[in-house]
């Protein structure tokens, strides 16, 4: 599929930062002159020098993968790639952990998508994550995030193994959200992990974890601690002693390679530096001053909303705003000023 010159050369207008980690920054927006074409930029020009080789290695894999799947229904469209980063179409849809499809039609379409990718010689290699699967507004399947994708020149054993693992990971999603739809054949496939996958878990994954979590201070945020219960009372007492602070709400979020961080939303007109000076040791990792906390009818803070902001869960927030549109005026300023821009997820 060829991109028209007026689209490929159009100026990117940023709107929302979705994620920022050591390897890239993900920003959604639009193209100037094309308001009906939402796009997303994986921005690479701000990556620190020591992470640049890996960041561009991942970017080149994504570029090759996106070029190979052009024209496949459910795959993003690569618009351009340059020293700034790579720009692709924004795929409208709901992440699988929210959509939780129970209809056989979605899984049938997801298999169709993997089959067409396989014909193009592409394996995704990262669809174990439910957030990389989408249910589009018309109920179709879509995939995003091709950073780990492989484009295979031949259909040898490695290709067949990786394609099988893609399918097996789709079946794991099916087992999570629609277990009654699994066939006996699919259940047998789920019970047998390929030998290369077992070798990866035993050898390469520990090395990968050491590099990313220890050397590069980056992780998937595994493990939780109840820091709110342990440190919250002293923090709340110290902050609430100030006459310009009217309330404090505490949430947790996943720290890179360090467990769990404490995120404090403080209802005040003080600046963040002033709040940090008031906090006892150990202080919360993030302190966000807010003009007004979102509240329930009884006046208590909406901790469900604040937890989604603290963990940068924009998809869930968008779904919440659709079901509760009156929340918009209260939480949009908080979302715009949020301090955690990673996509790590707390796991108990």
Q: Locations of the language-model features?
A:
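Conserved C-terminal "lid"/linker of ANL adenylate-forming enzymes
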Residues: 249-254, 263, 277-348
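Catalytic-loop of the protein kinase fold
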Residues: 119-134
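C-lobe/activation-segment region of protein kinase-like
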Residues: 136-218
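Conserved structural core of kinase catalytic domains
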Residues: 55-59, 64-109
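C-terminal boundary motif of the adenylate-forming
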Residues: 238-257, 263-267
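Juxta-kinase regulatory segment immediately upstream of eukaryotic protein kinase catalytic domains
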Residues: 1-17, 200-201, 208-225
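ATP-binding glycine-rich loop module of kinase domains
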Residues: 11-67
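Core catalytic subdomain of AMP-forming adenylate-forming
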Residues: 226-248, 282
């Amino acid at each position: 599929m060829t991109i028209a010159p007026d689209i490929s050369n159009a100026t990117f207008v940023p709107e929302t930062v979705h994620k920022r980690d050591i390897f890239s920054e993900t920003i959604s927006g639009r193209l100037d002159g094309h308001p009906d074409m939402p796009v997303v930029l994986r921005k690479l020009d701000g990556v620190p020098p020591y992470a640049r080789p890996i960041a561009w290695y991942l970017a080149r894999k994504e570029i090759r993968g996106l070029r190979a799947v052009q024209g496949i229904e459910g795959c993003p469209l690569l618009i351009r790639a340059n020293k700034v980063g790579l720009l692709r179409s924004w795929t409208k849809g709901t992440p699988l952990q929210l959509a939780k499809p129970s209809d056989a039609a979605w899984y049938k379409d997801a298999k169709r998508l993997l089959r067409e990718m396989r014909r193009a010689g592409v394996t995704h290699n990262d669809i174990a994550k439910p957030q990389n699967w989408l249910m589009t507004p018309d109920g179709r399947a879509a995939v995003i995030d091709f950073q780990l994708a492989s484009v295979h020149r031949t259909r040898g054993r490695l290709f067949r193994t990786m394609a099988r693992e893609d399918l097996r990971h789709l079946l794991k999603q099916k087992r999570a959200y629609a277990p009654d739809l699994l066939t006996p054949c699919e259940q047998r496939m789920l019970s047998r992990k390929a030998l290369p996958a077992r070798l990866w878990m035993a050898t390469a994954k520990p090395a990968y974890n050491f590099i990313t979590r220890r050397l590069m201070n980056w992780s998937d945020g595994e493990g939780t601690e109840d820091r709110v219960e342990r440190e919250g009372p002293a923090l709340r007492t110290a902050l609430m002693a100030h006459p310009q602070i009217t309330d404090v709400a505490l949430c947790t979020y996943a720290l890179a390679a360090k467990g769990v961080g404490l995120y404090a939303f403080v209802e005040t007109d003080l600046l963040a530096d002033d709040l940090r000076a008031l906090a006892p040791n150990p202080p919360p990792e993030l302190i966000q001053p807010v003009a007004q906390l979102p509240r329930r009818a009884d006046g208590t803070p909406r901790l469900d909303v604040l937890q989604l902001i603290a963990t940068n869960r924009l998809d869930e927030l968008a779904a919440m705003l659709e079901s509760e549109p009156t929340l918009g005026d209260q939480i949009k300023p908080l979302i715009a000023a949020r301090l955690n821009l990673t996509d790590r997820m707390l796991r108990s």
